[in-house]
Amino acid sequence: MEILCHSAPLHEIKAEASLIFVINKEFSHEWIADSELFGSVGFEGKEGQTLFIPQSKTLYYALDSLTPDSIRESSAKALRALKKYPFSSFKVGIYTQESLECLEAMAAGFLLGDYNFETYKSQKSESKLTQILISLQTHLGRQIDSKSFETILARQSAIARAVNLARELVNTPPEDATPQKIAQAAQKVAQEHQLECRIEDEKFLEKEQMGAFLAVSRASIHRPRLIHLTHQSPKPKLKVALVGKGLTYDSGGLSLKPADFMVTMKADKGGGCAVIAILQAAKELGLELELHGIVGATENMIGGNAYKPDDVLRAKNGKTIEIRNTDAEGRLVLADCLVYAQELKPDYIIDLATLTGACVVGLGEYTSGVLGHSQELKHRFIECATQSGELTADLPFNRHLKKLIESKVADVCNVSSTRYGGSITAGLFLSEFIEESYKEKWLHLDIAGPAYVEKEWDVNPHGASGAGVRMVLQFLEQLTKES
């Protein structure tokens, strides 16, 4: 989708169709030419209501407030609606107050709303829409500088490409997204964007004594891979390590999932795919930092050599783990990868994982959990997530929940002794593999809810959303500004 800006007023721009947002039922605005028809067709200007007028080839989209979140979502949904018509282009004006936040949100909405996963469809949906023409004259008559627009568009385009890469990788079925193939996808990103890339196999994992990671992979015919991407700016202001859970398929292992719960488990690689995508965007955006992306890619399957409940595993840092449930496998892979990441001596560590169903139960499908020991760091991250348009909530650690992962036979147990607080106890488990010097510099993001939703929502299509990409990039940008 091509987005172009024009300095001319909206009515002077030539396009095959028009998109007009109706803000807070302001039917008298000069851009609204068909208001006399609204009453006869039942258009009241309620939030989310749409009306297409064939005579003027105009889609009206109503929203109650002019906030970035509202503009972003409305732009995505309006784009999807217009793609159903036989138009190759449409024009739209800018809706913004003094700041350019809403312009950013509009660009993001169009770019993120344009994605659709149809790789395996014999009949692809047909849309002629290829061009969006945006007037730089706002709905309040203010003129936006074209350079400001181009800067915003370039940034949002890089972010959208990354989000859509993550979506595509997560949506890809497990047979076509094995650990080896995800590693190949990472190599392709590295080659196209001049990133450093290391792909390590079982021999490396054995050498590094990553016993937890290796145990999870044992029963799969698709061998594990540790993916390590690096973006190195010429004068980095800081060093950050991202760690992603890359379970390309999770059957639950011997603690087998029920059939209904096994469907969509291709999405258990959501954290790892987000990490790969973030590295791509970091390079495109020219972020002034040294950024490491580490993905533990494997399957969790059943078989004669599968790891078992009652096993005791030894992680890379020497800690022993009692296994009581093989379906709590992602944290085992992350444990070894987090230890590996700390050896790089970064300033901050952030892990992303579709880690717990408990997080979805507690927060719903659309919100990610943010966990860590530093209240200040969590607060800063949540602010950045809000600016990016992603929903997050603080899930606080406490000493009582920590007792629930104690083991009588090992240093720690891989699951809690009760069914409650599962997303927090999972985070506390990961904390066991974070050195004391990094406790205040580490964040755990549980993206299990929004990573894959089987319906359209916000700017997202059915399926993978690319959860984590936007908010982590926003946070990395903020860190570089502060450094």
UniProtKB/Swiss-Prot annotation:
GO biological process: proteolysis
PROSITE patterns named in the record: CYTOSOL_AP
Top-level EC class as recorded in UniProt: hydrolase
Residues the record marks as active site: K257, R331
Cofactor(s) this protein requires: Mn(2+)
GO cellular component: cytoplasm
Pfam families noted in UniProt: Peptidase_M17 (PF00883), Peptidase_M17_N (PF02789)
Entry EC no(s): 3.4.11.1, 3.4.11.10
Keyword Cell inner membrane: no
Enzymatic reactions: Release of an N-terminal amino acid, Xaa-|-Yaa-, in which Xaa is preferably Leu, but may be other amino acids including Pro although not Arg or Lys, and Yaa may be Pro. Amino acid amides and methyl esters are also readily hydrolyzed, but rates on arylamides are exceedingly low; Release of an N-terminal amino acid, preferentially leucine, but not glutamic or aspartic acids
Cofactor info, note text: Binds 2 manganese ions per subunit.
Keywords of this entry: Aminopeptidase, Cytoplasm, Hydrolase, Manganese, Metal-binding, Protease
Residues reported to bind Mn(2+) 1: D250, D327, E329
Compartments reported by the entry: Cytoplasm
Binding site for Mn(2+) 2: K245, D250, D268, E329
Molecular function GO labels: manganese ion binding; metalloaminopeptidase activity
Function: Presumably involved in the processing and regular turnover of intracellular proteins. Catalyzes the removal of unsubstituted N-terminal amino acids from various peptides.
Family, as annotated: Belongs to the peptidase M17 family.
Name the UniProt record assigns to this protein: Probable cytosol aminopeptidase
Biological source species: Wolinella succinogenes (strain ATCC 29543 / DSM 1740 / CCUG 13145 / JCM 31913 / LMG 7466 / NCTC 11488 / FDC 602W)
Gene: pepA
